[in-house]
Amino acid sequence: MEEFQGYLELDRSQQHDFLYPLIFREYIYALAHDRGLNRSVLLDNVSYDKKSSLLIIKRLISRMYQQNHFIISVNDSNQNKFFGYNKNLYSQMISEGFAVIVEIPFSLRLVSSLEETETVKSYNLRSIHSIFPFFEDKFPHLNYASDVLIPYPIHLEILVQTLRYCVKDPSSLHLLRLFLHEYYNWNTLITPKKSIFAKSNQRLFLLLYNSYVCEYESILLFLRNQSNHLRLTSSGILFERIRFYEKIKYPVEEVFANDFPATLWFFKDPFIQYVRYQGKSILASKDTPLLMNKWKYYLVHFWQCHFYVWSQPGRIHINQLSKHSFDFLGYLSSIRPNISVVRSQLLENSFLMDNAMKKLDTLFPIIPMIGSLAKVKFCNTSGHPISKSSWADSSDSDIIDRFVRIGENLSHYYSGSSKKKSLYRIKYILRLSCVKTLARKHKSTVRTFLKRLGPKLLDEFFTEEEQIFSLLFPRTSSTLKRFYRGRIWYLDILCINDLVNHE
């Protein structure tokens, strides 16, 4: 944000905080280009760094100044004179530049809020693994959890409307609407993985989708505030108790349908926990399923009335944490009892007591992971390793580095797994697939290739963490062995690997 503060001060004084004129500034596209170059190595570099140049940017801005080029009929959309032969490149440049512009209000709001609250920036909280210590601390005390799939908006206009609260410039919203209408299919959000979240325009559409999700989450804050008001008010003032008990005799659906505005006042709000990543969220509670069904109804009703999305109640699954596991962020988590026996001595009598405590168990999803490996041709559907034929043309070191990198990323991400046996099986599949790929390249058998290369080839698949722990803590000690196999949460994981994301 600091890198273009100087540019913004000049534009603010001249344009009164309008964002629309920034689309004609060359430094906006330069910033978008630099951000593409500085992406994390874990992500694909999808920027236009090899095609972009200052001359192309100047040509694009000069064409945008000619407003008649923006007036394009629907019938003539295939022969767009504005983009010409550089249609894909120009549209990508505009989308990435516009993403930088729209991020400005959000960045300014974040900076001002941090300054007001004097909050110290903690980049560790950005790690995906920071959610699991929260699970370990809160979820063992809860009873029910709602597995919620946030519906996709059926129309791009909904995404544009969600920005109107933060972007006060109508011209920018009109430009975004025109850009989306002319160069993208309005119905592509129904199948987001195919077109709208294409890698070439991922930044802009992720920004729009995140603003849409923030709008969806606003109802949770509203319901929480409404329910908290009940704690400060006497129940006798709010309603008559006889009428209340009459209502709960009827089915939950009738109560909600007949008394929608007042339903919030009939139940005390218990300890609610909410977490979300991408389009999946979990709403956990300590109370009865009746309250969870109430929250379920409000979410579905909010989607239908505010976003005009016909959401089926089946997108929200209510499960009991002690009996069902939930899949979140690639881990299969469940709450299981941890029983410990305590011996108590009282004078001459001694007796044993069972102390039962709930504990979060995070497991490695072996079956979905084998399915992910089978899709990218590392093994078959049964988990039998096969050679990666598309990599056979690469050098030996390149092939080994690719397999080792995949194994290290999986070991790093699943370091918090309660049981590592399934993870070791996946690493075995990767090792044998690497050997088979090398043997295929050299037209040899696996046994012959291993004899020629030696066992040091497989040592490459040990991660740096495993090597350090094996040196510091020998496995002869049972205590250190349990520590070696314990769960470790890292604070540098900012994204999910494609193999981890099974959906």
UniProtKB/Swiss-Prot annotation:
It comes from the Eukaryota. Keywords: Chloroplast, mRNA processing, Plastid, RNA-binding, tRNA processing. Signal peptide: none annotated. Its main location: plastid. GO terms for molecular function: RNA binding. GO terms for biological process: mRNA processing; RNA splicing; tRNA processing. The keyword tRNA processing applies. Pfam families: Intron_maturas2, MatK_N. GO terms for cellular component: chloroplast. It is found in: Plastid, Chloroplast. Belongs to the intron maturase 2 family. MatK subfamily. Usually encoded in the trnK tRNA gene intron. Probably assists in splicing its own and other chloroplast group II introns. This is Maturase K. It comes from Rosa foetida (Austrian briar). The gene is matK.
